[in-house]
Amino acid sequence: MELADIRREYTKGGLRRKDLKNDPIDQFNFWLEQAIKANLSDPTAMTVATVDKDGMPFQRIVLLKNVDKDGFVFYTNLGSRKAQHLEHNSKISLHFPWHPLERQVHITGVAEKLTAMENMKYFTSRPKESQLAAMASRQSSRISARGVLEGKFLELKQKFANGEIPVPSFWGGFRVKPQSIEFWQGGEHRLHDRFLYSQEQGEWHIDRLAP
């Protein structure tokens, strides 16, 4: 089969302005709850897009760890490529692809670092193995073999066998403060429904976009 011949119809239903919540965070939480209840694989997985100092875009999958009225939170190694990008350009884009529900959410905004207290609160809630992995990996750095990483993990596991694991200085979180949030719902005959929430002077405005 040719790639150009791969297509399907979207039949889950449309999205109408009257059904939208006034606040996009409330609308996002409503859709996220439905994605979770539908038993989607990794419903909190999102594509995080950043750009380097030359304007070259990069994307990767990261898990959303919190969302509230202030924005969307994720955690990472502060030496990672994404964190280095955000140091010189805090503009960021998030994308949630909920394919089985024929939905997408696209977010643009600005990322800011979380406080040390916020980092510690989340880090200490993680399983011990996840804490050790965060400490063992210098994300995005070059390594000669997987064995180097596994060896470091085992070394740290032995070192902290009977004690608490400190929050690494090179690990932390970011909060993405949204400037726009677009909700996309697949529609019949490719007449998809798109609604864009844009923030102007502290208020959210909603516009329907052509598919």
Curated annotation (Swiss-Prot):
Its cofactor is FMN. Pfam families: PNP_phzG_C, PNPOx_N. Its EC number is 1.4.3.5. Disulfide bonds: none annotated. Binds 1 FMN per subunit. Pathway: Cofactor metabolism; pyridoxal 5'-phosphate salvage; pyridoxal 5'-phosphate from pyridoxamine 5'-phosphate: step 1/1; Cofactor metabolism; pyridoxal 5'-phosphate salvage; pyridoxal 5'-phosphate from pyridoxine 5'-phosphate: step 1/1. The keyword Cell wall biogenesis/degradation does not apply. It catalyses: pyridoxamine 5'-phosphate + O2 + H2O = pyridoxal 5'-phosphate + H2O2 + NH4(+); pyridoxine 5'-phosphate + O2 = pyridoxal 5'-phosphate + H2O2. Substrate binds at R7, R8, E9, Y10, K65, Y122, R126, S130, R190, L191, H192. GO terms for biological process: pyridoxine biosynthetic process. FMN binds at residues 60-65, 75-76, 81-82, 104, 139-140, 184, 194. Keywords: Flavoprotein, FMN, Oxidoreductase, Pyridoxine biosynthesis. One of its GO terms (molecular function) is FMN binding. Homodimer. Catalyzes the oxidation of either pyridoxine 5'-phosphate (PNP) or pyridoxamine 5'-phosphate (PMP) into pyridoxal 5'-phosphate (PLP). Belongs to the pyridoxamine 5'-phosphate oxidase family. This is Pyridoxine/pyridoxamine 5'-phosphate oxidase.
